[in-house]
Amino acid sequence: MANTRSAKKMVRKIAARTDVNKARRSRVRTYVRKVEEAIASGDKPAAQEALKAAQPEIMRSVTKGVTHKNTASRKVSRLSARVKAMA
């Protein structure tokens, strides 16, 4: 348990930041899921549009400190490869 005033304040700040980061991570997952659903349905134009919407959101999570740069790049790369491989 936090004893000092500053430690108690940090507990509050960390809790608030955690909530924001959870929301950002969830938002990224939603965009990725939309791309994967479009890929699974076999609709290439929809998959391309979903990827176009997901890519900036994934990279935004990097600038906000939620995701590591390499992780985001890997996600974008693998999704775009799967969309490109569609017939």
From Swiss-Prot:
PANTHER family: 30S RIBOSOMAL PROTEIN S20, SMALL RIBOSOMAL SUBUNIT PROTEIN BS20C
Keyword hit for DNA-binding: no
Source organism of the structure: Hyphomonas neptunium (strain ATCC 15444)
Origin superkingdom: Bacteria
Keyword rRNA-binding assigned: yes
One GO-annotated biological process of the protein: translation
Pfam families hit by this protein: Ribosomal_S20p
Keywords per UniProt: Ribonucleoprotein, Ribosomal protein, RNA-binding, rRNA-binding
Family: Belongs to the bacterial ribosomal protein bS20 family.
InterPro entries referenced in this protein's UniProt entry, alphabetically: Ribosomal_bS20, Ribosomal_bS20_sf
Any one Gene Ontology molecular-function term assigned to this protein's record: structural constituent of ribosome
GO CC term, one of those recorded: small ribosomal subunit
Biased composition (Basic residues): 1-15
Protein known as: Small ribosomal subunit protein bS20
Stretches assigned to coiled coil: none
Function: Binds directly to 16S ribosomal RNA.
Region of interest (Disordered), residue spans: 1-22, 64-87
